[in-house]
A protein has these predicted regions:
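Acidic loop->beta-strand submotif enriched in PP2C/PPM serine/threonine phosphatases
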Residues: 83-93
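Short, conserved beta-turn/loop elements at beta-strand boundaries and strand-helix junctions
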Residues: 78-84, 127-129
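Segments surrounding the PLD/"HKD" phosphodiesterase catalytic module and close analogs
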Residues: 109-119
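Short beta-strand-centered aromatic/proline hotspots
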Residues: 70-76
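Phosphate/adenylate-binding glycine loop and adjacent helical scaffold
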Residues: 100
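Protein maturation boundaries and topogenic segments
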Residues: 1-69, 89-91, 117-119, 123-138
């Protein structure tokens, strides 16, 4: 019994603080990710260390729908100019600007604005499934 509890504790610690598997669903990241639930490996350390960079694909808590997550690409980090902005909009400290790769079918920072980095759950480093489309993203 103690062995099972110990395993559970370690598993919880690893998936909470180091790496985790999650599903990315929806058309907003096509063609990079499939709309039909790609299973991806998340690096959960990078956001905690402030190592999220422009171009990274991240999973974050949804800014508009509690209990849901979004999978988007970081298009600007704090201090960088918002891409495509007609004004001199700059991402504020502690935030990132998230966009879907499929701009025509994505609800992203163009709708909900800058996203606080503390709701970024992890950086996508690997598509695990479908197996024939496995891909490294770092």
């Amino acid at each position: 019994m103690w062995g099972l509890a110990k395993f559970g504790f370690y598993f919880w610690g690893v998936t909470t603080y180091v790496v985790d598997l999650t599903l990315c669903t929806g058309p907003s990241m096509e063609p990079t990710l499939n709309a039909n639930s790609d299973l991806v490996l998340l690096d959960r350390v990078s956001p905690r260390l402030g190592r999220i960079a422009t171009g990274d694909i991240v999973v974050a808590d949804s800014p508009t729908r509690p209990g849901e997550t979004v999978c988007k690409r970081v298009s600007a980090v704090a201090g960088e100019r918002v891409p495509g902005s007609f004004f001199a909009d700059v991402v504020p400290p502690g935030c990132v600007w998230l966009l879907g790769d499929n701009r025509r079918n994505s609800t992203d920072s163009r709708v909900y604005g800058p996203v606080p980095t503390d709701i970024v759950k992890g950086r996508v480093v690997l598509r695990v499934w479908p197996l024939d489309q496995a891909r490294v993203f770092i």
